[in-house]
Swiss-Prot record:
Protein name per the record: Aminomethyltransferase
GO cellular component, one term: glycine cleavage complex
Gene name, Swiss-Prot/TrEMBL: gcvT
Disulfide bonds: none
Reactions performed catalytically: N(6)-[(R)-S(8)-aminomethyldihydrolipoyl]-L-lysyl-[protein] + (6S)-5,6,7,8-tetrahydrofolate = N(6)-[(R)-dihydrolipoyl]-L-lysyl-[protein] + (6R)-5,10-methylene-5,6,7,8-tetrahydrofolate + NH4(+)
Source organism of the structure: Chloroherpeton thalassium (strain ATCC 35110 / GB-78)
Key word Protease present: no
Amino acid sequence: MKYTPLHKIHQQLGAKLVDFAGFEMPVQYDGILVEHKAVREAVGLFDVSHMGEFEVKGKGAKAFLQNMTTNDVESLCDGKAQYSLLLYEDGGVVDDLLVYKIADEHYFLIVNASNIEKDFDWLKQHQPDDEVVLENRSDELSLIAIQGPKAEAVLSKLTDVPLDAIKYYHFVFGDVCGKRTLISRTGYTGEAGFELCMANEHAEEIWHALIEAGLPFGIVPVGLGARDTLRLEMGYSLYGHEIDHQTNPYEAQLGWITKLQKGDFIGKNACVEKKLHLEQTLVGFTLTGKNIPRQGYKIQDLSGTDIGVVCSGTLSPTLGKPIGTGYVKSSFSKIDSKVYINIRGKLQEAAVVKVPFLHKNR
């Protein structure tokens, strides 16, 4: 089992700890509903140090990432980030990731914890030459997310960086508690907030300082349970649920980060083909009853014929009703289409709805 540099803090806080991607991580502290509400209404603090960090630099780094990822690396300016995908040749998803441009031919990637080794191996397999340097920095860096409408007010107590000047999906390097930190206006909750990346040895100090500065604002530590309900309300994909090696970006409603016009990239031909012949599509749905849809449950039509499968589901703390995502035959993907979730042998009526389930301003 692996541990993040903040593991002792989670133990001291009495967090319920679970195995996630080989890390012992907090799934909740005071409860998923309390933590979810705090992020939507005030501010929450997340340890996401289990995520992976890679550095890509050297002559040819831009061209390398342009070939490896679906989004247009050429469009990045210094200090800007983009959401993107790594694909296999058949269009299946290796992983989703964030690509940060630090400087010309110098990039920083954040990948999913469950895919660190796989992703790094995939990049190494396609490394063009020794001029492009790939470095896996996952074991030396920590990642803390501060999210919610009061996140900026809290973080501003600990840094001289003008946070209001950092636009959405932009970042700067600056001092937090006097320690060099990558400060990025990004997140996985739909709320305003920042993700902070720092050397492991500074993580505890920064965490404690954020908690102390956040007490007047109602800050709470937030576990992976609420992280999941928050992301699901926004319709954000989670690797292993909405996307995996068998899903194509166009099926997963990720055509907006798949830039077919940019030139060649791994998986492009499969994406071109899939865009023309979409047999299944990822949709969001709400249920009329109280039962919660779970990953793997069948989605059926009224006659009981299989038309798809559930990817994720939860009782939305904000909406107060069950929501979910799933793949359905494209003919059932229109908004307001009636579908049925087979929950323990009983068909529960659901309606396809527009995603995100919530509309937030960041």
